[in-house]
């Protein structure tokens, strides 16, 4: 192929080139003389090309081992653009047999091992390179018109390097000055031109380095410092020896490593952190433990190039800088007036400790990223990890420090290391199914998608609320489109919705629908299927003579329920409950004789239920849980699937787990272990009980922002001691202090409270439009009316022609009436009917009018409703912009600093189900959460009182300021530097705490040693200490005495 012709430049062309950026960026391509600085840009007469000479100078430093090339222009002798004075030697190689970027292998010597030959710095001339020259392919600066660009991957071999002629440079100069590059929009990031990153220009013979291994170790360390520790150890350390050495270096991100090792309870890490706390006076007995934390942080080493004045200038816009400066100046003057200027890390630590939200930490990072700042982000990140691990350890040691500070740091660092916004673009996982929306996957989701299921594997995905577990399964099924999957869940509506979003290689079913197809259909064809659950009323009618009664019938029902939920093949005495309620409503232990009678009656009842013949007794009909049990006992085979997805795995019963685990294919259990709210149905948490081969976590919620995420994480932290994995949200705004806007969801624990709220919001001249979750029919307003009719005297029923529609309730008209019905409900422990009876007794004669009003205000489309009402059980899986948590959940009676007045209260006294219900309610919110006073009290158990620091000089501008605590008479002292202010908050009962300034004594009672950032211990101790009087509602006081 012919070589391209040189372009002859006119004088005008030379003037354009002299003014272009190429004259600056390519200084080696210009002739510099004393007379004419643009002399090298003039046209050069065509001369005969001479033979190439052997060049000896090499211009790339030694640390660019993999990319070293022979220089083709001796700059000391000639800097002419059109000459090439270097020649390659035949047979020389550019790569050594084993380089520092080779993959680690067992038994292989390291890069510095004895006997390893020094790497050759030459290369051989290849026919491919000669072809590139012949075709005019330009690879200057790494941009090739003929071949695709490199990708940021780590291959074991390097791409062959092309040789560049001097004519290529001249050709490109003319093309860039007068022509538009058509491929400009398609090229990727520019490769590295040389070891000086092109700042000194590039030579015509020199090819740009485009391989990540060509980066210096210092640059790699800087890049790796931004990655999660899990990625560094599980993935990057396996790439090559060089990367492993960088990651294993004890001087590389030491605090980040120590933080994660401490969370894992590694013995050496715990010992090291404990030693730091002890040696630096960061102990529970020390009033100055927080100030000592700042002092220790100030010892953090930083680069010699750090200019404190420039860093301070970068922080000038941070809202907490004046408070931080005042704190350090007053309490740590030696760090503020140091010889080299103010200690920057002391100011950073003070800002972090005074921060009241994640926004304060994010603003701090933003300021320190400014070009005017001389600190590096790895140094800042290391400092934050240092503070984080010490704060975490302080809480472990019982020091009264708020978990909010650690949460703020963790949240920012998590987003920095895992958020998609940290990279220019995160690759979206393409959908192979037409019409499916492409979504961006998080780092945690991508780890799951990369796992290939094998037979008999058991994978657990522990997913917090709103973390996209369903979308993760959808993307998994799309990626592994050649496999067949079975998606199973418990809720029919969820299964229907799954059918619409999953690809065609996934079959979506409920467990009961599969059992119905194999077993239940047979009973339906014989009209022997009970559409409702077995009740003590049904069972009582078939018990043996002399052994009846609703209490014994309840015992038999519970025995059968335990058997249906278990994986056992035979019904035994072990299925009989240990405890029951007697006729006086007291909880007593079941006697052995009652156990034997209970298992005998339950076995007889189960035998009659299994028969396919006709039956006259309602109790002998097969139930849904009954035919599911029969299907489990038949040992079904699901061998046609490659893997089974079990959604909401925390609600699995042992019977269901037995069905799934007995299959030969792979199993994926997905769920949130903290959303287990169906233990009363015999559910056990499969995410804890089932042994696994692999476990993954989804911790970042797409549903809500930081404030709501903090409340959910604190409930798990304080009430369930969950600290190893932390719930985080997104970067969008969310509020928890009572700012309700637009549509509001009112979530309750019981149906009785739902009815109360429906009555309240539909009152007045302009009643609100409401929507009951699950529909008005499922709420049971008809049964409320029937119970009210049952309550009316017989004469009144006849007079008003009142007819009870419900078959079961109608039976009590001719039995014992309303009083007998109520006794039965109490003995049967039927919570649903108990709630309805409570509603009827509370509103009595108003029931018909209230039910009619609720039905009139109810609309089916929730998008047009002003209020959405329902219980947490029905709201599970849903989400709403604003959630209003009602006041019938588990209660913490007072704030932490007043709990010593209630010695009988224990968080551990309540079951996990109660805390799970509250957690589910809170995590339904997307934008705003309206809390109860009890929920705020839970946050105080973690040290969060919604306080923010202000300069005392600003507080006292208007005169004397009193403490906002009602029973406190202290005033804010003038000689203190900072004062804490309680932020206002509106509770779900519409009461408002307007907040205000706290005296330093009251602040110390609430936030402990953090108060000594505002005033000295002597000043705080000199103030009068106020003890608040706690007045509890009578029923709550009795409850705490009982427990």
Swiss-Prot record:
CDD domains: F-box_FBXO18, SF1_C. Residues 30-56, 101-191 are annotated as: Disordered. One of its GO terms (cellular component) is SCF ubiquitin ligase complex. It is an enzyme of class 5 (isomerase). Residues 138-184 form the F-box domain. GO terms for molecular function: 3'-5' DNA helicase activity; ATP binding; ATP hydrolysis activity; DNA helicase activity; DNA translocase activity; double-stranded DNA binding; single-stranded DNA binding. A motif (APIM motif) lies at residues 807-811. A motif (PIP-box) lies at residues 57-64. Its EC number is 5.6.2.4. ATP binds at residues 463-470. It catalyses: Couples ATP hydrolysis with the unwinding of duplex DNA by translocating in the 3'-5' direction; ATP + H2O = ADP + phosphate + H(+). Part of the SCF (SKP1-CUL1-F-box) E3 ubiquitin-protein ligase complex SCF(FBH1) composed of CUL1, SKP1, RBX1 and FBH1. Interacts with RAD51. Interacts with RPA2. Interacts (via PIP-box and RanBP2-type zinc finger) with PCNA. 3'-5' DNA helicase and substrate-recognition component of the SCF(FBH1) E3 ubiquitin ligase complex that plays a key role in response to stalled/damaged replication forks. Involved in genome maintenance by acting as an anti-recombinogenic helicase and preventing extensive strand exchange during homologous recombination: promotes RAD51 filament dissolution from stalled forks, thereby inhibiting homologous recombination and preventing excessive recombination. This is F-box DNA helicase 1. It comes from Homo sapiens (Human).
């Amino acid at each position: 192929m012919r070589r391209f012709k040189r372009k002859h430049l006119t004088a005008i062309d030379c003037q354009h080139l002299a003014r272009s950026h190429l004259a600056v960026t390519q200084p080696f391509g210009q002739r510099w003389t004393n007379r004419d600085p643009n002399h090298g840009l003039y046209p050069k007469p065509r001369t005969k090309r001479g033979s190439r000479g052997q060049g000896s100078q090499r211009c790339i430093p030694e640390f660019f081992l993999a990319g070293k090339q022979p220089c083709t222009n001796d700059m000391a002798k000639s800097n002419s653009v059109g000459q090439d004075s270097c020649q390659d030697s035949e047979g020389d190689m550019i790569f050594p047999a084993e380089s520092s970027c080779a993959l680690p292998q067992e038994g292989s010597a390291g890069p510095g091992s004895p006997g390893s030959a020094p790497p050759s710095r030459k290369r051989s001339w290849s026919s491919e390179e000669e072809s590139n020259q012949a075709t005019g392919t330009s690879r200057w600066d790494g941009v090739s018109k003929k071949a695709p660009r490199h990708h940021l991957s780590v291959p074991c071999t390097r791409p062959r390097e092309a040789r560049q002629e001097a004519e290529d440079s001249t050709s490109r100069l003319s093309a860039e000055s007068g022509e538009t590059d058509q491929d400009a929009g398609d090229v990727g990031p520019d490769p590295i031109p040389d070891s000086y990153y092109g700042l000194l220009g590039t030579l015509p013979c020199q090819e740009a380095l485009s391989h990540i291994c060509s980066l210096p170790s210092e640059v790699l360390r800087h890049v790796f410092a931004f990655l999660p520790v899990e990625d560094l150890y599980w993935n990057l350390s396996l790439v090559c020896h060089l990367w492993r050495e960088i990651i294993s270096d004890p001087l590389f991100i030491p605090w980040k490593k120590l933080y994660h090792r401490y969370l894992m309870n590694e013995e050496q890490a715990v010992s090291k952190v404990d030693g730091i706390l002890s040696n630096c006076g960061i102990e529970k007995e020390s009033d100055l433990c927080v100030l000592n934390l700042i002092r220790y942080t100030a010892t953090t080493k930083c680069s010699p190039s750090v200019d404190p004045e420039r860093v301070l200038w970068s922080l000038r816009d941070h809202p907490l800088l004046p408070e931080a400066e005042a704190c350090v100046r007053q309490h740590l003057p030696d760090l503020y007036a140091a010889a080299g200027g103010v200690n920057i890390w002391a100011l950073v630590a003070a800002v972090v400790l005074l921060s009241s939200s994640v926004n304060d930490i994010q603003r701090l990072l933003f300021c320190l990223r400014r070009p005017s700042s001389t600190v590096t982000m790895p140094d800042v990140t290391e400092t934050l990890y240092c503070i984080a691990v010490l704060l975490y350890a302080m809480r472990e040691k019982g020091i009264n420090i708020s978990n909010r500070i650690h949460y703020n740091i963790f949240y920012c660092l998590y987003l920095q290391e895992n958020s998609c916004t940290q990279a220019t673009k995160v690759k979206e996982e393409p959908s192979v199914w037409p019409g499916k929306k492409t979504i961006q996957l998080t780092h945690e989701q991508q780890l799951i998608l990369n796992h290939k299921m094998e037979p008999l594997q058991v994978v657990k995905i522990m997913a917090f609320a709103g973390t996209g577990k369903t979308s993760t399964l959808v993307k998994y099924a799309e990626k592994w489109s050649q496999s067949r999957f079975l998606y199973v869940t418990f809720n029919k509506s969820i299964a229907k919705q799954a059918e619409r979003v999953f690809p065609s290689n996934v079959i979506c079913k409920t467990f009961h629908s599969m059992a119905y197809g194999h077993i239940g259909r047979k009973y339906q064809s014989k009209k022997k299927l009970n559409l409702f659950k077995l009740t003590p009323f049904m069972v009582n009618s078939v018990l043996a003579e002399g052994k009846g009664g609703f209490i014994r019938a309840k015992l038999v029902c519970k025995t059968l329920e335990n058997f249906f939920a278990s994986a056992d093949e035979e019904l035994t005495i072990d299925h009989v409950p240990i405890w029951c309620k007697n006729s006086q409503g007291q909880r007593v232990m079941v006697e052995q004789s009652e156990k034997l009678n209970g298992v005998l009656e339950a076995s007889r009842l189960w035998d009659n239920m299994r028969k396919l013949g006709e039956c006259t007794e309602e109790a002998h009909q097969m139930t849904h849980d009954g035919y599911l049990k029969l299907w489990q006992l038949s040992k079904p085979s699901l061998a046609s699937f490659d893997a089974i997805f079990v959604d909401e795995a925390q609600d699995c019963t042992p019977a269901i787990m037995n069905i799934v685990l007995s299959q030969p294919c792979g199993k994926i259990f997905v769920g949130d272990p903290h959303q287990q709210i169906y233990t009363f149905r015999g559910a056990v948490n499969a995410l804890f009980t089932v042994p696994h081969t692999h476990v993954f976590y989804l911790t970042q919620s797409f549903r809500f922002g930081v404030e709501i995420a903090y409340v959910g994480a604190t409930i798990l932290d304080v009430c369930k001691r969950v600290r190893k994995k932390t719930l985080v949200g997104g970067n969008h705004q969310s509020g928890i202090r009572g700012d309700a806007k637009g549509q509001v969801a009112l979530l309750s624990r019981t149906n009785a409270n739902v009815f109360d709220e429906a009555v309240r919001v539909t009152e007045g001249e302009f009643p609100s439009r409401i929507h009951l979750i699950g529909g008005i029919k499922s709420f049971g307003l008809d049964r409320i009316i029937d119970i009210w009719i049952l309550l009316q005297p017989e004469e009144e029923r006849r007079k008003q022609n009142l007819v009870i529609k419900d078959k079961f309730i109608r039976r009590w008209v001719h039995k014992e009436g309303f009083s007998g019905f109520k006794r039965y409900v109490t003995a049967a422990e039927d919570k649903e009917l108990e709630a309805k009876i409570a509603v009827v007794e509370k509103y009595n004669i108003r029931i018909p009018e209230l039910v009619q009003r609720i039905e009139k205000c109810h609309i089916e489309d929730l998008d047009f409703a002003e209020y959405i009402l329902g219980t947490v059980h029905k709201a599970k899986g849903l989400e709403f912009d604003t959630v209003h948590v009602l006041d019938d959940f588990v209660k913490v009676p007072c704030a932490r600093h007043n709990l010593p007045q209630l010695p009988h209260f224990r968080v551990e006294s309540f079951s996990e189900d109660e805390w799970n219900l509250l957690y589910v309610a809170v995590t339904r919110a997307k934008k705003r959460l309206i809390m109860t006073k009890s929920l705020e009290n839970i946050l105080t158990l973690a040290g969060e009182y919604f306080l923010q620091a202000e300069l005392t000089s600003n507080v006292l501008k208007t005169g004397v300021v009193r403490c906002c605590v009602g029973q406190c008479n202290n005033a804010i002292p003038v000689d203190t530097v900072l004062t804490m202010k309680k932020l206002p908050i509106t509770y779900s009962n519409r009461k408002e705490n307007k907040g205000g300034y706290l005296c330093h004594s009251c602040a110390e009672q609430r936030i402990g040693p953090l108060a000594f950032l505002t005033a000295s211990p002597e000043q705080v101790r000199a103030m009068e200490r106020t003890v608040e009087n706690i007045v509890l509602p009578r029923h709550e006081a009795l409850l705490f005495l009982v427990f």
